[in-house]
Amino acid sequence: MTLPELPKDLVEEILCFVPATSLKRLRSSCKEWNRLFKDDKRFARKHIEKAAKQFQPLTLTKNYRICPINVNLHGTTPSLEVKNEVSLVDPHSKNSAAQFNIDRVFHCDGLLLCTSQKDSRFVVWNPLTGVTKWIELGDRYNEGMAFILGYDNKSCNKSYKAMSFNYLDKDSEIYEFSSDSWRVIDDIIKPPHYMDYFRECFSLKGNTYWLGIDRRRRPPDLRITLIKFDFGTERFGYVSLPPPCQVHGFEASNLSVVGDEKLSVLVQGGSTSKTEVWVTSKIGEANVVSWSKVLSLYPKPDVGFWHGLSFLLDEEKKVVLCCKSKGWMEEEDEENVYSVGEDTKFILLNFGVQTIGGYSPIIVNYVPSLGQIELAGSKRKRDY
């Protein structure tokens, strides 16, 4: 008996609910599906809206490579495993097998913006589809530059933008993917805060968030602020923080994302070892963001929370994976991560590899998607 052929619209509707990584395995089974997954913007938008999200933590190794991390929080003993490196071939190298050396990575909507130390270009890469877009910086490049990626979340046609920051210049520039061009936004008013553009920024719903320290204040009067850059209005703004962050003086403050809908903050007071983890309501559902406390921790003296350390929160299980601080004089061969939950018991997990940076692992919460990169007039390459 021959199975009836389903209508095309029904097939697409069914595929919209299939997880992104499963679609990758289906590409080779049908040429039409392969085209649909790689090139159809309409289907990509529907899939991002409807499919169940898969969260895949990534890390950067000391060899400037990206590695996925498998995290298991089930059972009595949490564990993690660093998987094999993900390949990103450098098309500008004379060696066809040469890899692009990645020293910083920024995640937005399933796309990774990757930069390389002292390299006058960056790449935006979708690891799921293999599509890349290389952006040359030319004369605008200097070693003090950092980049973020985003989009106007109020527009029905998602058009990505990259923004450059330059410590040596007050001006910032926007790169438009749709026109393959740069423009200066010289009327932008930057907040009077110190922001670590390299490590402490996160994308959520197309916008970028940082924790900043007001440059106008001096210890012990320091206070942290949550800063937002809106890619739709191309303006900075502020988001309220939970009560512990509003007091004067603190030992450490760190930001992270929860899934693809919430922000979380880890803050340690300056006069006590007590550390709290707070999480926002769903970003974008209301004009005012509300916070709720998820965990209160009392770390041992040898468990330090430095500014900029990576952490991941499993809100449902109330478990935090937090990277271990490593002092400048420590000579450990491998990095470590702590797992801690409501019982405040810190479990040391061996990371298994040396990571970039030298003193603490970097963890990126990556969400695979069919997010498509506009390629107006630029070269692209697919890695299969």
From Swiss-Prot:
Domain F-box, residue spans: 1-46
Protein name, UniProt field: F-box/kelch-repeat protein At3g44120
A Pfam family: F-box
Keyword rRNA-binding: no
Native source species: Arabidopsis thaliana (Mouse-ear cress)
Segments annotated as Kelch repeats: 156-202, 264-314, 352-384
Keywords: Kelch repeat, Repeat
Lineage: Eukaryota, Viridiplantae, Streptophyta, Embryophyta, Tracheophyta
Matches recorded under PROSITE patterns: FBOX (PS50181)
Calcium as UniProt keyword: no
Taxonomy, superkingdom: Eukaryota
